Every structure is written in structure tokens, then in C-alpha cells.
Amino acid sequence: ITFAATPTAESILGSMRKSMLAKPAVEAKFTINGGQGPVQGTICIEGAKFAMATPQLKVWYDGKTQWTYLASTGEVSITEPTADELAASNPFAILSGYETRYKARKLTDSNGRRRVELQPRAKDTGFEKIIVIADTAGKWPQAINIYFDDGRQISLVIDHITGAANQPAKLFRYD
């Protein structure tokens, strides 16, 4: 009789990160719950770069500079975000810095999914905790719940996620 080892929080996060790096890019459709109610969007991630779109905003990040377009004002803001600011605009970025930036702890789940709670090691991140929920195989994230220090909560539910081919560099830059 062989028993499979119970996955640790770190192995669950590592498995998701490995799945996200197995192809040159990752494309996902998601729903954000919190704030102004449910908002659907798409994201394409390639390494540290990403492009995200919802009806309210569009965000491009080329690995250094982030452009955020707000549909309500028609204005674009340009920043060079910190790691914490990136995690707020792209919750998938949490998976790339979990080893050094968060303390990870495995949580139980009655639906057989794999859940990990991340608590920031630094005090000034703006986050109280983040809960990442993986599929039953632990390969892909299904949801990322962010709890902010000020009591706000945002839930990012991943409706569909898949590996993708290399993307043109212009996809990650505002033009």
C-alpha cells in the first residue's frame, strides 16, 4: 500500500506556479466580487507582464511600467508599482512572490479543493491576509480572496484559465 503525501501549503502554491509557467503565457477569464458588485474581466500574463481588461478599467504592465485606464474618466495613470501595488492590481502576482513575502498555511476545505492562507511578512502591505483556492489537483487557482487592512474584501473567481502561446510585447504596453 502506498500513501500519497499530504500536500503542504508551499507545495500547493508551487504546483500552481509551475502550471502557470508551463506555457509562455496564461489567459484567464474572471469575476471580481466586492466593491461595485460582480465585474467580469480577462487577463493575459506572460512572466512578470500582464494585460487586464474589465468594463471599468484596463491595465497594462510591461514588467516595469503600469498604465491604468479608467473608463469613467477616460484618463490613463502611469506608475512604476511596488510589489504590493502589483498584487492589488493583479492578484495573480501573489503567486510569484509567496516564498519571501508571505507566511503560508494550508486550510481545510469541505469541497476537496486546496486552500492556502497567506499572511504578509511585512506590516505595511495593506493586506490582512490572502486566501488562494486551487482546484482539487492543486494545479490551477480557482479563486483568490484578498482581505485588506481596512476591512474591505475582494474575491477574484477564476471562471476559466489556460496556458497560451507567446504574446506580442505591445499587448503589455499602453499605446
Predicted regions and their residues:
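Short, exposed beta-strand/loop patches in secreted or surface proteins that constitute
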Residues: S19, G41-I45, K58-V59, K103-D109
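A generic structural motif
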Residues: T31-N33, A53, Y69-A71, Q119-R121, ...
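N-terminal leader/targeting segments and the immediate start of mature chains
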Residues: T2-P38, C44-K49
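Flexible, surface-exposed loop/linker segments and immediately adjacent secondary-structure boundaries
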Residues: P81-G112
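An acidic-aromatic
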Residues: P38-S89, I154-S155
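Gly/Pro-enriched, hydrophobic low-complexity segments
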Residues: T100-D175
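Short, solvent-exposed secondary-structure boundary motifs
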Residues: P7, F30-G37, E46-T54, P91-T100, ...
